[in-house]
């Protein structure tokens, strides 16, 4: 993953939101979706992604299942009911953090 500490601290939130939007995804698919959504600016490494996925699973926010695709076993992740609740909580925390940064640094919201 890029060296940006803000992104590292937001990885679980990003994963949860992606799974909320896409229902179920496998690891490589998550990395490619983040790359696509960021215009190539955010590159998730396996070393960053899989520990975050395993932590979310251990915390009961994700469940997994496997499926054979092209003679390869692929591990998919999806939100549990508790994980679904966690998404809105994490998004609220992220929004509050962004609001605080904008206030403290006197930043204007980005317009795209």
Model-derived regions: residue spans:
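Basic amphipathic alpha-helical segments that dock to polyanions
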Residues: 49-50, 56
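Basic, amphipathic "hinge/linker" alpha-helix immediately C-terminal to the N-terminal HTH DNA-binding motif
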Residues: 73-91
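N-terminal helix-turn-helix DNA-binding core of bacterial DNA-binding proteins
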Residues: 5-48
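Amphipathic alpha-helical dimerization/coiled-coil segments
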Residues: 85-112
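Beta-hairpin "wing" of winged helix-turn-helix
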Residues: 57-73, 78
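Short, contiguous hydrophobic alpha-helices characteristic of membrane insertion segments
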Residues: 4-5, 61, 112
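Intrinsically disordered, low-complexity serine/threonine- and proline-rich regulatory segments
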Residues: 1-7, 90
């Amino acid at each position: 993953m890029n060296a940006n500490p803000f992104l590292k601290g937001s990885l679980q939130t990003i994963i949860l939101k992606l799974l909320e939007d896409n229902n179920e995804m496998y690891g490589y698919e998550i990395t490619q979706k983040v790359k696509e959504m960021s215009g190539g600016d955010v590159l998730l490494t396996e070393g960053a992604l899989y520990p975050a996925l395993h932590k979310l699973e251990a915390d009961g926010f994700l469940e997994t299942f496997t499926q054979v695709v092209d003679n390869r076993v692929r591990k998919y992740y999806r939100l549990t009911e508790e994980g679904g609740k966690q998404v809105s909580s994490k998004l609220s925390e992220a929004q509050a953090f962004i609001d605080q940064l904008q206030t403290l640094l006197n930043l204007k919201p980005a317009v795209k």
